[in-house]
Amino acid sequence: MSSGTILSGAEIIIKALRDQGVDTIFGYPGGAVLPIYDALFKQNHIKHILVRHEQAAVHAAEGYARSSGKVGVVLVTSGPGATNAVTGLVDALMDSIPIVCLTGQVPTHLIGNDAFQECDTTGITRPATKHNYLVKDVNNLARTVHEAFYVAKSGRPGPVVIDIPKDVQFADGVYRTPGESMPKSYRPQVKPDLNKVEEAVELLANAKKPIFYVGGGVINSGPVASQLLTQLVRMTGYPCTTTLMGLGAFPAHDQQWLGMLGMHGTYEANLAMHGCDLMVCVGARFDDRVTGKVSEFSPNSKKIHIDIDPSNINKNIRVDLPIVGDAAYVLEDMIRIWKARNKRADQAALKVWWDQINFWRARECLRYEKTDRVIKPQFALERLRAAIAPREDVFISTEVGQHQMWAAQFLPFNKPNRWLTSGGLGTMGYGLPAAIGAQIANPGALCIDVAGEASIQMNIQEMSTALQYRLPVKVFILNNQWMGMVRQWQELLHGSRYSESYSEALPDFVKLADAFGGVGLRATKVSEVDDVIREMIETPRAVIVDMCVDSKENCFPMIPGGKAHNEMLLGPEDRVSEATPEEGMVLV
């Protein structure tokens, strides 16, 4: 079908999606999008996944996008359909996930009349998206869809909303191909200033105590960026740490990886960040969970910040050398210049630095009490790690809370795009739909949602989606009967006053899985853990595992609110309440 063909608005949308390479849409029908659903019914190229809630549609699209490198596509109706999607859109915005969300709207002549299921979708989603559109002319529809995909995936990725009135979907208009629809005003800088890259290489070569600080921007750049990062880190011999969103950008099995940094990061990663003399930040944004007390953040280091989004530069932390560009281009130039100038690290200084780091490592900050009396959540994850170790096709999603931090600490990620979590917004209910999206994108893979018994209930209805489409996703619940992270902070900072953090009426998750048509498993003893995990993996259907873990276990190490990296606490013997100043409590 060539450019200039006359189609209905709904047909234009489907044709534009096909031309953008879309094979899957996550959505929920309603009156304002029925013409689009009718056009979907008449074709066989794009698969639609019917979720049970519009928030889950966006999270599933996020999981699809994050695990595949493609743009996730969402289709929802007007009014409550659009407003239900907002949480997912903000989540995608904060974690830089490319999403195109199509929303229905009341007919153009009714906009502003408080019509049935009308809301100001563009007004509501303006702060929740990278960009949004309201299309009132069917002849602008194809151009808008193509432009939305370009905006969503270029520069710093993010969600884009296209609001489409119902009469525009019925109207006939001219179809335009992607090549005719490129925006003229939006051209993000992807190639860096070479003079700055050369300066960065000089700083890198002359450093005595350097560290690479890597974020999700490396993963968003694509697999080549992760390969280049690994090459540069190994060439220099320098240590590397990653943020929560950067897990997998550098292989976890490599001795140069110090683990995750930040509030619940490793002792060695945080102290290396505090004590370094050169910090090379690649694709991270110096957020508050990483920096701790800003005025004492890595006080003696020069800081290089590589980011595709210029608005991130100097936003939270003042840096010495900003480099705007795509991580892959910048890393490629750094490697080329390092080789061309025959650069070498100061091996004597580097040995002293590594000796110090290995001294910190010897503290074994992730140690926990080993016992046969109760299942420790860390133990459950260690056994899960052992069970999935032989496989390379494993994708882990999480909900939000203690289980999320333990998963980040105890599950190693050696490749990008295998770790799916809500980092910026911290959205409970993210993990199950994200696992569904990952399973759709990777049909033969093992997709596991590590969950808490509180978080999983936010979008538990999506088990029905998994069963409808015969998706063998696994939900691995660390059930401690509490909102774990809330309880932890109430214990440590609020005098053990557990205000509304205990779940008194939990469902029987084994029976719940059975009610959905899936498989439910439970472990209450240490001796049962391995068998339950093995059965979960071997079962070719959706599974919920109820792993009954220690209800009082807290997540350590941790940096108390308002404290610096070198003031982190390693375990319950450290007094958190005494270590946290009053001004720091507002940062929790």
Q: What would you call each of these model-derived segments?
A:
Residues 2-4, 139, 175-177, 202, ...:
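Phosphate/pyrophosphate-binding active-site segments
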Residues 11-22, 63-69, 93, 151-156, ...:
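Glycine-rich phosphate/diphosphate-binding loops that line cofactor/substrate pockets in enzymes
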Residues 13-14, 18-22, 36-40, 356-433, ...:
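Active-site diphosphate/adenylate-binding microenvironment
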Residues 34-108, 110-117, 226, 267-287, 314-316, 405-483, ...:
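Thiamine diphosphate
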Residues 66, 217-304, 412-444, 457-460, ...:
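Glycine-rich, anion-gripping cofactor-binding loops and their flanking helix/strand elements
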Residues 103-144, 166, 246-355, 533:
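Glycine-rich, acidic loop regions that bind phosphate or pyrophosphate groups
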Residues 147, 151-206, 365-366, 570:
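Conformationally flexible catalytic loops at phosphate/diphosphate-handling active centers
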